[in-house]
Amino acid sequence: MGAYRYVVADVFTRTPLTGNQLAVFTDARGLDGETMQALALEIGFSETVFVLPPEQGGTARMRIFNPAAEMPFAGHPVLGTAFVLGAPLQRGVIELETGAGIVPVTLERDEHGALVFGRMSQPVPTVEAADEQVVLAALGVERSELPVELYDNGARHLVVTLASEAAVSALQPDLPAVDALQVTGLNAIAGSGGRWRSRMFWGHGEDAATGSAAGPIACHLARHGAIRWGEEIVLEQGVEMGRPSILHARADGEDSRISAVEVGGSTVVVARGEFRLPDAPL
């Protein structure tokens, strides 16, 4: 082992110190899974990424860890890693190998060549009905405006639709009950047309910006007629945490069948550092 450099990025925002935090180790060769998990716990962000050489023809392979476990797929780590790698590589498309397959991210630059936006093609999720009473009880509400369903794109997300943004903002879920649902996240949304508010809860708290949920939310709204297939929505998340985030999402399909999912947003790099592990020279 040796000294391992990392980048800290704020994802789904253009403003430093907002959005969702992410640490990216840009060259994780030599680290085993146990050490990666320990580093993710040490950093304490919702996710930490370790970049490795590709194995399936992509630009790079990535392993994603939250403080407790490895994850096959998560949205804000994919977008943030594409920004971190895209700047030095000067590529228009970054293809990241994840546990859920290869995820391409198309990067957009301004007139000065700086990265300003990225769009990822997400895995098409499977959909199944959820136990509505159990889910609503965990969230602390009595009803959902649309059916409560579970979407699985490598991450497992429940979606509940409330009547107003104020109702979303006022939520105080039962986190042990949320944890017992055994999902990546329980998402509550409200809005209309192209603008929606969202909050995502998991067993130990709340997430500031959830890219793996944004695509399923667009799918959910299109499947149930709240928006048109192919219509892009803008999701605002993280407000109640003091980390406002903006996510763009779009789903293509017909009737209730999903054919493609795209999620986009911006990222800003806010810090760089280095971990020196026990046998690294001081």
Describe the function of each predicted region.
Residues M1-F73, V78-L282:
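Active-site proximal loop and beta-alpha junction motif in alpha/beta enzyme cores
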